[in-house]
Every structure is written in C-alpha cells, then in structure tokens.
Amino acid sequence: MTDQTTRLPIRRALISVSDKTGVVDFARELVALGVEILSTGGTYKLLRDNGISAVEVADYTGFPEMMDGRVKTLHPKVHGGILGRRDLDGAVMEQHGIKPIDLVAVNLYPFEATVVRPDCDLPTAIENIDIGGPTMVRSAAKNHKDVAIVVNAGDYAAVIESLKAGGLTYAQRFDLALKAFEHTSAYDGMIANYLGTIDQTRDTLGTADRGAFPRTFNSQFVKAQEMRYGENPHQSAAFYVEAKKGEASVSTAIQLQGKELSFNNVADTDAALECVKSFLKPACVIVKHANPCGVAVVPEDEGGIRKAYDLAYATDSESAFGGIIAFNRELDGETAKAIVERQFVEVIIAPKISAAAREVVAAKANVRLLECGEWPAERAPGWDFKRVNGGLLVQSRDIGMIKAEDLKIVTRRAPTEQEIHDLIFAWKVAKFVKSNAIVYARNRQTVGVGAGQMSRVNSARIAAIKAEHAGLEVKGAVMASDAFFPFRDGIDNAAKAGITAVIQPGGSMRDSEVIAAADEADIAMVFTGMRHFRH
C-alpha cells in the first residue's frame, strides 16, 4: 500500500509550457532548491534570458528537435525518465543512461484560442494540436507514484511550498495527476468538437465550412458541491459547473451566508437570475418552482429595486412565500430589510450585495445570500441541454429578444406607447414561464401569471384568477403568450377580462380568426415572429 505521507523530493524537473504565466519564478525557486531543469524551445529561451540555468532537452537526449518542432520530447531518455518505476526499472534506466525526471510542468498548445479565430483554417488548427505535451502529461500522471505533474500555473506556489517542506506527498501527487487527466481530457474534447464540425465534402476547410453540432459532444464540468439530496429526498445529487467560467450566473455566484444550496435552490435561482437579466432598468423577479410568480421593473428615480420588490411581491404574495428573489442592481439595506421583515425567502441573489444588506440579512441565518457579479447587456451565446433516457438534447440558448421596431401590428388599432412598453415587459417575463405561458401586466408589473397548463386558454384563466386573488385589476392590462393562439377563444376571454393589448408570436393556421376577435374587441395585437416555449 502506498504511504500517503512520505514526501517525494525533486531532483530533476522538465518544464515545457505554452502558457508561461509564473514559470520564470517557479523555475527560479526550483533551481534554488537544487533542482536540475530540463526545458524545450521557447520555454528554454525564456528561462535562459532570465538568468535561470537549464539544460535543453535536445542536448540531454543527444537528438535535435526536428520537423518544425513536431518532434522534441518524444524520446526514450525523456519518457523513460518519466515512466520509469523507481523500485523496478532502476537497472534498465542505468543501463541506457536514462535519468529519473521527478517533476513535469507542462501545459498545452492553445488549441481553443486558435480555432475560435475567424481566419483559422484546418491546417492551422492541425498544427496547434499538441502531441508531445499530452504524451508527457499522461506519462507523468500515470507514474504519479514517483513523479509530480503540474499542468496549472495556479499550482506552482503550493508545489514550491511543499518542496521546501521536504517534498510532495502521495496525496498531493495523486491530486496533481487527476488534474492532469482532466486537463488532457478537456483538450482532446476540444479537438474532437472542432474536427467533428468540419464538412469533409468541402474543398476549403475553414471556419465557414463548420457545422453547428459536432459528431460527438464534449464538455467538461467540475463538481462544485455535493448536495444532501436531489429534486426529491430519495435522489442523490451534486452540482457541477462549467470548467471555463462564463458570464455571471448562479454557477459563478459567491454565497455570502445561509444554508447550503439545495438542488431545487440552484434550479430556481437560475430561473430567477436569468429572467431578471432580461431587463435593463432596475427589476425584481420572484420565482417559485422555476416559474416567475412576480416581476416588476421600476426606474431608479421612481423607486428602483425597492419599489420593484413591492410590486413583484404584490403580484402573488402567497406563492412568493419560500421563493427565490433576484435583482439586477446592488441589493441595498432598505430593500433587504423589507424582504426579511415581510416574508420567508430561500435565496436572494444580486450582482452586488451592500454591506448594509449583508448586516440586515445576517439576522436570518438560514437565508442564502448570493452575489453573482455584473453581466453584459448583450447575452452570450451558448448551449442548453436536456437529458432524456439514453440521450441528450442540445440546442442553442434562447437569447432571442425583441424591440419595439421588431413588432408587427396586425390589428386595426395600434398599441399605445405605454402598451408597447408593457407588451415587451410581459413578453420578456413569458419567456421564463413554463409553457403554456400567459402573462398579464400593467405599468411594467405582472398582475397575473398562468403557467404550465396543457391548454393555453386555461393558462389565461389561471392568470386572471391569480390577479383577482391578489386584488389586482386586469382591466387595462396587456397579455403575453409564449406561443400562438390556436383558436380565438384565448382572445375572447382576454376581452372579457378587460385586456387592451396582446403580444404573441403568430403563425397559427387560424391567425385571421384570432386577429378578427381582437378587432371586434378593439384589442391591439402585435406578432413577434418568435416563439418562447419552455418545458
């Protein structure tokens, strides 16, 4: 059994890195500890230029770099020194003049950064596929019993600290080996993703000839948290986040206080935050079971997020109990005080949490308080996944947005300026409501939300019931539908409720009947030409 605590001293290290962040200081520290450095190409030159003693691999092997650098480290004196088992292969190594290499610091050619360039063609991509690097990484990781592998510059300081304490323990070497295999796995996945999108029937194999979806889909996620249970107590669960961080999200958020996030907390917080990101002016979104139950937008000079919270809560105070609250502005102390005094809340998330707000929420120790950072106004493209038994559905993220100039007025009466503001607001909310989705809104406040019904007209009825239960007036409100109305009954019911304007995608075989129903009731209706199903 391997001794977990015995420290491995380092006498010889091979350093060959593409990302040279921190490598000069790392090598200097190694030399100060009496470590002999082997190096290649650009790394060797960088170390030499900084006065660090190193042996070029070509001099060590007696074999020059060749084929424009394609063959540098693929040599028995290198791989024998890395793979050699110190307790079994010592005699063979000595017979062939192979010296043990105790530490390998390698990271790989920037393949991903190369292939995202618009001018990158297939030959350029191929030349940026690293061969020697992954081979050394895998060799060192396989022989982690005797060799330390470092693929991340962020580990340099910890490695030096351990060496100063006498060497690296087996537990440290095992962890570094795991990181190495994760690194090469992600690297090979990038290559497979890229090559899998190439149209082999075309003569010019550049980025313009690439398809959207590769033959195999490779994406790496890192475990951020093991959870007490999943969606239900009998299910086990963990939260994994993308290895490469993107825009501000629930995955990048920092938890400032409160109980550990549950599986459902993460899912609901994601729904709330992604919805509130849709609005440029101060907004509040309250979510329950992944559905917005209250949303409001209030300009800064009219009360900002403090007023927006009041209005969002007023939409459905009953459902807001135990909900998730998201803001698109810094959470201030006054708004935080209003929340904790008024309701039980599971999670509050905002781009920034003020010191005053933190102090207020601290009195409620179980409330999970998350700070996610700012996000760009323009949403980044990406992928959405839905697991099915035996498969995975992959689609581009629904980042489609509409502006007033995108709307097609299809009724005799055009919507007023205020109705247009409310229609676009309601449309943004409907995008995040489970289909079939109906949203009633007035003055950029939801007054009723109907979610998840098999019949669109029943979702409209539920929205009306919600408004009545909250004591909010539907008359004079607008209505948004995430998909087209298949029959005129949805508009007829809206007219009876007092709806004055409707926004929907259009595209039904019976659009003319639906438009006629709106005209009969003097309802203004606009088509977006864009559907927002959410399942």
From Swiss-Prot:
Gene3D superfamilies in the cross-refs: 3.40.140.20, Methylglyoxal synthase-like domain
Involved pathway(s): Purine metabolism; IMP biosynthesis via de novo pathway; 5-formamido-1-(5-phospho-D-ribosyl)imidazole-4-carboxamide from 5-amino-1-(5-phospho-D-ribosyl)imidazole-4-carboxamide (10-formyl THF route): step 1/1; Purine metabolism; IMP biosynthesis via de novo pathway; IMP from 5-formamido-1-(5-phospho-D-ribosyl)imidazole-4-carboxamide: step 1/1
Molecular function terms from GO: IMP cyclohydrolase activity; phosphoribosylaminoimidazolecarboxamide formyltransferase activity
Catalytic reactions on record: (6R)-10-formyltetrahydrofolate + 5-amino-1-(5-phospho-beta-D-ribosyl)imidazole-4-carboxamide = 5-formamido-1-(5-phospho-D-ribosyl)imidazole-4-carboxamide + (6S)-5,6,7,8-tetrahydrofolate; IMP + H2O = 5-formamido-1-(5-phospho-D-ribosyl)imidazole-4-carboxamide
Key words of the record: Hydrolase, Multifunctional enzyme, Purine biosynthesis, Transferase
Gene Ontology BP, a term: 'de novo' IMP biosynthetic process
Keyword NAD: no
Xref: SMART domains: AICARFT_IMPCHas (SM00798), MGS (SM00851)
Signal peptide: none
GO cellular component: cytosol
Matches recorded under PANTHER family: BIFUNCTIONAL PURINE BIOSYNTHESIS PROTEIN ATIC (PTHR11692:SF0), BIFUNCTIONAL PURINE BIOSYNTHESIS PROTEIN PURH (PTHR11692)
Protein family (similarity comment): Belongs to the PurH family.
Record-linked HAMAP family: PurH
Record's protein name: Bifunctional purine biosynthesis protein PurH
Naturally occurring in which organism (per UniProt): Pseudomonas aeruginosa (strain UCBPP-PA14)
Lineage of the organism: Bacteria, Pseudomonadati, Pseudomonadota, Gammaproteobacteria, Pseudomonadales
Gene (name only): purH
